[in-house]
From Swiss-Prot:
Protein name: Probable prolyl 4-hydroxylase 8
Gene Ontology MF terms: iron ion binding; L-ascorbic acid binding; procollagen-proline 4-dioxygenase activity
Membrane-spanning segments: 20-40
Pfam families (UniProt xref): 2OG-FeII_Oxy_3 (PF13640)
EC number: 1.14.11.2
Subcellular localization(s) per the UniProt record: Endoplasmic reticulum membrane
Organism: Arabidopsis thaliana
Note describing how the cofactor binds: Binds 1 Fe(2+) ion per subunit.
Job of this protein: Catalyzes the post-translational formation of 4-hydroxyproline in -Xaa-Pro-Gly- sequences in proline-rich peptide sequences of plant glycoproteins and other proteins. Hydroxyprolines are important constituent of many plant cell wall glycoproteins such as extensins, hydroxyproline-rich glycoproteins, lectins and arabinogalactan proteins.
One GO cellular component term noted in the UniProt record for this chain: endoplasmic reticulum membrane
Parts of the chain on the Cytoplasmic side: 1-19
Positions annotated as glycosylated: 46, 222
Catalytic activity as recorded in UniProt: L-prolyl-[collagen] + 2-oxoglutarate + O2 = trans-4-hydroxy-L-prolyl-[collagen] + succinate + CO2
Membrane topology: Single-pass type II membrane protein
Amino acid sequence: MAKKPKQLRNKPRKSFSTQTFTVVVLVLFVILILVGLGIFSLPSTNKTSSMPMDLTTIVQTIQERESFGDEEDGNGDRWLEVISWEPRAFVYHNFLTNEECEHLISLAKPSMMKSKVVDVKTGKSIDSRVRTSSGTFLNRGHDEIVEEIENRISDFTFIPPENGEGLQVLHYEVGQRYEPHHDYFFDEFNVRKGGQRIATVLMYLSDVDEGGETVFPAAKGNVSDVPWWDELSQCGKEGLSVLPKKRDALLFWSMKPDASLDPSSLHGGCPVIKGNKWSSTKWFHVHEYN
């Protein structure tokens, strides 16, 4: 007697709703990973927000806060503020401690000399009326405190320490200034030491009673929208300006994201009207600075 053929049992199929739920969970999981890595950001629910390029929106935008010191030591919290997208400029508030500011000033005082500028024809440093401050350079890794500051700057900029020049400490007295200029080079000599300058970090080591702003005359946007507009000197109102505040660090890029030079990074130091201005500058190059 012939055996009946065995009937093949079909495996139970997942319902369409189950498959959809699985896909949704996977998509949400991927989105959470991207948000955590900072690659993707969730849309803002603020209905009153302006367009991204509006200075009213991007000024005073807090991107990061971290506990740092307390009210007694006067160091406050560290937080990052977007100043401009053209040029790309950011202020890291309370980047330095009071002690670090005083340390850099004390290191520089014994060797201060009249500041110079780069001659575009020869690549050498020369005297110029456009720069009337005094200053000195500190070797990279001059001491443990300087090295700690330099490493922190690299963490802030994501540029290796070896791509940076040594810190330059500057002192401006009443009436002293630095006319608007670009930090990138126009000569063929200076680029041999590490390529073109890509970014600048300017740290303010002292408060200034009046004047001494860092001004960007070619910045895009309505520069009068900044909340500190009424505090600016006449020079400071000639462009987008940053007030010199002790412990703050200003980062701006001399190159665009496509590695082309950014003319809007034109900047200058306004004359000090009242008080003294101490600052420290770190220039970064495309390659290792030799």
